[in-house]
Amino acid sequence: ATFKILISPTPVIGPDRPTKKDNHSNKGFFYEGENIRKFISSQPNMYVICGDRHWQYVSKHRKYGIVEFSIGPNSMEHAGGWKQDNVKPEHLYLNVVGGVMTVTIDPKDSPKIIVSHYDVDGNELNKFVATAK
């Protein structure tokens, strides 16, 4: 496959809140997370999609260059858990909102992956596009 996507119930890249200890993006499972990140970084055109975050984001790991997408909640009622102005260096996109996310693979010419975040009304908020290496 040109593109490979790991779908994880929790973040592998993050960032996550400092008090959290239950996923691969923080100190609680650092060893396991580091092994996963090393493997992912050895795979060309591999991305991570995670759930269980109550905000939308796209982040890029500073050491490994891995890009992770967080879908966020389906409703505004469940959006929260992160401050909108708490943008970290690894964030390429951050929005504490509900909505949906789509992933499209365009195989024509130079293959591309297109990941778009939408709000609860279907308005596109962010679009990430990358060409296969």
Give the residues covered by each predicted segment.
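Long, structured stretches of catalytic cores involved in phosphate-ester chemistry, encompassing
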Residues: 1-133
